[in-house]
């Protein structure tokens, strides 16, 4: 359910962009993201920092897009959000912590060196996406950027998550792998 809530603003943005224009879509994105935050809190009594950062950026850059009638602000939002995530992961590492380990370490046991590699891999991914967005947003037509934002980045993120999952599984202790496999077998039998 939580993952479905994450897609609603993107779907709303894409649909209204195709039906109207970037300004209507941006206004709807702001509203849909606010509703997503409220629903997430109502259902789970917690909102992740990444969601709050994303909402703040959507509200600020989306508001500027609408108020100044300049689509460049919403285009920059994507780059800035990815850059914030990359910087956040890098800073967490510099402070002796791994944000990725903080999110997943309660459920998965891995050596610190592996958590560090995963953390830096995500820093690289977010940095690459931030840079790629600048190119697509400002060198290609708006329609291409909207498709890239909605589909390209989404697919790339899913693919990277899956690759990270395989990497984690490869480095999990044998006992933990067996436990995960047993819990998967039980849920398949139900």
UniProtKB/Swiss-Prot annotation:
Main location class: membrane
Similarity comment: family membership: Belongs to the YciB family.
Cellular-component GO terms for this entry: plasma membrane
Keyword Flavoprotein assigned: no
Pfam families attached to this UniProt entry: IspA (PF04279)
Name of the molecule in the record: Inner membrane-spanning protein YciB
Segments crossing the lipid bilayer: 22-42, 50-70, 76-96, 118-138, 148-168
Record's subcellular location: Cell inner membrane
Superkingdom of the organism of origin: Bacteria
Keyword presence, Secreted: no
Annotated keywords: Cell inner membrane, Cell membrane, Membrane, Transmembrane, Transmembrane helix
Protein function: Plays a role in cell envelope biogenesis, maintenance of cell envelope integrity and membrane homeostasis.
NCBIfam families reported in the protein's UniProt record: ispZ, PRK00259.1-2, PRK00259.1-3
Annotated signal peptide: none
Gene (name only): yciB
Membrane topology, as annotated: Multi-pass membrane protein
């Amino acid at each position: 359910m939580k993952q479905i809530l994450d897609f609603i603003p993107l779907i709303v943005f894409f649909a209204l962009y195709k039906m109207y224009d970037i300004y209507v879509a941006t206004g709807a994105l702001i509203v849909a993201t606010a509703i997503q935050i409220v629903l997430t809190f109502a259902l789970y009594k917690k909102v992740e920092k990444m969601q709050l950062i994303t909402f703040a950026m959507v509200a600020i850059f989306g508001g500027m897009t609408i108020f100044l009638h300049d689509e460049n602000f919403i285009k920059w939002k994507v780059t800035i959000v990815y850059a914030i995530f990359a910087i956040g992961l890098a800073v967490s590492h510099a402070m002796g912590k791994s944000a990725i380990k903080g999110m997943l370490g309660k459920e998965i046991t891995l050596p610190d060196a592996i958590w560090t590699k995963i953390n830096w891999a995500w820093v690289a991914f977010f940095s690459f996406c931030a840079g790629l967005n600048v190119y697509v947003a400002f060198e290609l037509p708006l329609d291409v950027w909207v498709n890239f934002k909605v589909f390209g980045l989404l697919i790339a993120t899913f693919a990277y998550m899956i690759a990270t999952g395989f990497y984690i599984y490869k480095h999990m202790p044998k006992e933990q792998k067996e436990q995960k496999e047993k819990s998967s077998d039980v849920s398949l039998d139900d």
